């Protein structure tokens, strides 16, 4: 087995709540963590050995900080990055997780969709692309109504909307272009799937060893952003095997080591590929409660070349996010109801430590276990609903 010599220096590009859990898992293995993001006091910076603030889309700033710290591994945790700089650094011998190419492909919905549907032939929703409002109208018409319109470059549901008729396409075009990351004006338009489930299949590619899969995670999204998740999701065996086949195929095409969050729809009993993130997934926060090894521990073991003897479910588990209110903005942030949340049996609460609130921003998550998925989900919901934010003071 090819493993990274420990202790190693790991550099996180992105320091949000998922990066924070990666940093904690890394430090438990004796690693030194450098947390980089565009704003100070980001969640992972609060536990890292070193914190650096730079414009994340500035290629020169990104190259400078990586060359300065000479990490054993560069671990991207967000999508808004100067990916061309990562390719240049990789050519210099810096290891990017999973690879610079995979990072570049998956930050663009058109590139990952072209790979999955075009090159690999995976089943996806019917879709088209448009670079103007006029092209959007032409691309949407054959798909039927409603349609989903998204920027090809965005995250957390930014710029995503549903158009129920041709008259709403101009508004959808405006929302997509305004919500896009950078100056990209290309949008993807998809048929609206009436699905039974949305699932995440966390897929682990090892340096040496077979691809492994976590128990499937069910989740619900609103405004294109994760609201709750539960594990294990209830799938037919044939559906699980098909999801695993598709996940293995697309992650093999991307290459590299680490955990991949592969999202699927289950619609009319069929498994349909949706999206992919080459890193721990927000819906996978539930693995802190539902598995013997969390997605963050698995990611670290995979990228460091350490063994993963097994991935097993520890029972029914669920998560529910704690959101800022629709009118809450700024900081400092204070929390009420924490004691009430922690009084819920078999529950825990993670408050991410984000320095400022924004409307509907994810500020924490409640996790819970139970004798059934219904009990676990009910407990997570109760704990999350007990928490309220106060701004200022």
UniProtKB/Swiss-Prot annotation:
Reaction catalysed by this enzyme: N(1)-(5-phospho-beta-D-ribosyl)glycinamide + formate + ATP = N(2)-formyl-N(1)-(5-phospho-beta-D-ribosyl)glycinamide + ADP + phosphate + H(+)
Keywords: ATP-binding, Ligase, Magnesium, Metal-binding, Nucleotide-binding, Purine biosynthesis
Listed GO MF terms: ATP binding; magnesium ion binding; phosphoribosylglycinamide formyltransferase 2 activity; phosphoribosylglycinamide formyltransferase activity
Domain ATP-grasp: 114-304
One of the Pfam families matching this protein, by short name: ATP-grasp
GO cellular component, one term: cytosol
Nucleotide-binding in keyword set: yes
Binding site for ATP: 109, 150, 155-160, 190-193, 198
Source superkingdom: Bacteria
Pathway info: Purine metabolism; IMP biosynthesis via de novo pathway; N(2)-formyl-N(1)-(5-phospho-D-ribosyl)glycinamide from N(1)-(5-phospho-D-ribosyl)glycinamide (formate route): step 1/1
Enzyme class, UniProt record, top EC level: ligase
Biological processes annotated in GO: 'de novo' IMP biosynthetic process
Positions with a binding annotation for N(1)-(5-phospho-beta-D-ribosyl)glycinamide: 17-18, 77, 282, 354, 361-362
Keyword Magnesium among UniProt keywords: yes
Enzyme Commission identifier(s): 6.3.1.21
InterPro entries reported in the protein's UniProt record: ATP-grasp (IPR011761), ATP-grasp_carboxylate-amine (IPR003135), ATP_grasp_subdomain_1 (IPR013815), PreATP-grasp_dom_sf (IPR016185), PurT (IPR005862), PurT/PurK_preATP-grasp (IPR054350), PurT_C (IPR048740), Rudment_hybrid_motif (IPR011054)
Self-association and partners: Homodimer.
UniProt-listed NCBIfam families: PRK09288.1, purT
Similarity field: Belongs to the PurK/PurT family.
Protein name from the UniProt record: Formate-dependent phosphoribosylglycinamide formyltransferase
Gene name per UniProt: purT
């Amino acid at each position: 087995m090819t493993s990274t010599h420990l202790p190693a220096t790991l550099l996180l590009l992105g320091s949000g709540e998922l990066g924070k859990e990666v940093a904690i898992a890394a430090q438990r293995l004796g690693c030194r963590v450098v947390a980089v993001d565009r704003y100070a006091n980001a969640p992972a910076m609060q536990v890292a050995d070193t914190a650096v603030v730079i414009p994340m889309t500035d290629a020169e700033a990104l190259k400078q900080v990586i060359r300065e710290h000479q990490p054993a591994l560069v671990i991207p945790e967000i999508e808004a990055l100067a990916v061309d700089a990562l390719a240049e650094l990789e050519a210099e011998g810096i290891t990017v997780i999973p690879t610079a190419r995979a990072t570049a492909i998956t930050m663009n919905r058109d590139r990952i969709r072209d790979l999955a549907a075009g090159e690999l032939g995976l089943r996806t929703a019917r879709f088209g692309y448009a670079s103007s409002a006029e092209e959007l109208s032409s691309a949407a018409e054959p798909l039927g109504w409603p349609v989903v319109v998204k920027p090809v470059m965005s995250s957390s549901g930014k710029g995503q909307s549903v158009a129920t008729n041709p008259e709403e396409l101009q508004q959808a075009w405006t929302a997509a272009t305004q919500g896009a990351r950078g100056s990209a004006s290309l949008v993807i338009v998809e048929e609206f799937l009436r699905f039974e489930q949305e699932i995440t299949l966390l897929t682990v590619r090892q340096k040496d060893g077979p691809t492994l899969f976590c128990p499937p995670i069910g989740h619900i999204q609103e405004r294109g952003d994760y609201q709750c998740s539960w594990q294990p999701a209830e799938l037919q065996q044939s559906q699980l095997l098909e999801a695993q086949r598709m996940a293995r195929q697309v992650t093999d095409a991307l290459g590299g080591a680490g955990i991949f969050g592969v999202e699927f729809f289950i619609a009319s009993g069929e498994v349909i590929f949706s999206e992919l993130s080459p890193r721990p997934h927000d819906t996978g926060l539930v693995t802190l409660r539902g598995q013997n090894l969390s997605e963050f521990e698995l990611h670290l073991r995979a990228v460091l070349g350490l063994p993963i003897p097994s991935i097993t479910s520890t029972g029914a588990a669920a998560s529910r996010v704690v959101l800022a209110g629709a009118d809450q903005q700024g900081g400092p942030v204070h929390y009420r109801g924490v004691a009430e949340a922690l009084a819920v049996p078999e529950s825990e609460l993670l408050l991410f430590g984000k320095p400022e609130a924004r409307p509907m921003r994810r500020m924490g998550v409640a996790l819970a276990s139970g004798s059934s998925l219904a009990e676990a989900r009910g407990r997570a919901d109760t704990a999350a609903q007990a928490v309220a934010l106060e701004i200022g003071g």
